[in-house]
């Protein structure tokens, strides 16, 4: 690393960055050279870094290269990858995205690698997302009914027994919940209205692993909704459909769109979600967030800017 850090080219880039003279254009780096250069910038800067590439394959390659050098490297896959893989794989990618969103909310030094598609997408407003992060510690007075409602809003499924991420169960004064950001689920027990104990447990044996003092429970989905926002969105979707039908004469196109919208509305009413819900965020929020809202004070590195711009 020392030869790179002491090189004239790197020192020039470092000088530009320290003076805030952006953007800085760098040419002639090989694929491995890019990762080595990004590593050097990370070592010499106090800021976290976002690397944006033209597609998910390249983002994954850079992520794997950087992970060889550094511990705090995260890969944010695009939603298209999540939607079009088989269920088992897309489930893992769903948790991977949520893990990175959690890291974006932490003020720690890190590198996040993503594609231009993921970077340009819209997200739940940051403050709304943060308001659904539950922090519970021993000695807190809590209302399990209120927590249960918030977990459902946050994408958790209520079941008799917790067996996987994104699930919770409630039996009297015992709440089991498996956040996507945790290796094991939590078992939270009350004495009256006060949290008496918090333990992690094994999903297969249901036996306790260890006692902990606090549990941080992140949402189990990206799009956070309430009954009110769903009703508002359905009203806007139906109005948009009606306006479209008045402008288009092709009956087949109108019928196909009507079936799609009504199917999404039905799923929204029953399950509070549907497969391509991220594309409909403007119906739910007047001002959906972008990654810029989540990534404050980051250094942005655009790999192959021409190809990213072409996307």
Regions found by a protein language model. Give the residues of each.
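ASCE RecA-like P-loop NTPase motor cores
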Residues: 1-311
């Amino acid at each position: 690393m020392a030869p790179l850090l002491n090189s004239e080219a790197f020192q020039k880039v470092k000088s530009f960055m320290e003076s805030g003279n952006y953007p800085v254009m760098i040419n002639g780096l090989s694929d491995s050279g890019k990762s080595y250069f990004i590593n050097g910038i990370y070592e010499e800067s106090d800021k976290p870094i976002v690397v944006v590439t033209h597609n998910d394959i390249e983002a994954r390659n850079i992520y794997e290269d950087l992970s060889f050098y550094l511990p705090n490297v995260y890969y944010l896959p695009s939603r298209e990858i999540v939607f079009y893989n088989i269920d088992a794989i897309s489930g893992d990618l769903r948790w991977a995205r949520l893990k990175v969103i959690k890291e974006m909310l932490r003020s720690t030094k890190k590198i996040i690698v993503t594609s231009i598609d993921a970077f340009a997408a819209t997200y739940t407003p940051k403050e709304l997302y943060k308001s659904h992060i539950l922090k519970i510690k021993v000695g807190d007075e809590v209302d399990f009914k209120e927590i249960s409602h918030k977990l459902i809003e946050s994408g958790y499924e209520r079941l008799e027994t917790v067996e996987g991420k994104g699930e919770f169960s409630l039996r009297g004064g015992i709440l089991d919940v498996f956040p996507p950001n945790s290796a094991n689920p939590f078992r939270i027990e009350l004495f009256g209205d006060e949290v008496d104990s918090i333990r992690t447990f094994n999903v297969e044996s249901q036996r306790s692993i260890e006692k902990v003092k606090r549990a941080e429970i992140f949402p189990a989905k990206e799009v956070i909704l309430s009954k009110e926002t769903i009703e508002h969105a359905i009203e806007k979707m139906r109005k948009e459909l009606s306006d479209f039908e008045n402008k288009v004469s092709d009956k087949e196109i109108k019928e196909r769109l009507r079936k799609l919208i009504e199917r999404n509305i039905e799923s929204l009413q029953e399950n509070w979600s549907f497969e391509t819900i991220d594309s409909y965020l403007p119906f739910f929020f007047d001002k959906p967030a972008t990654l810029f809202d989540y990534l404050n004070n980051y250094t942005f590195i655009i790999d192959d800017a021409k190809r990213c711009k072409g996307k």
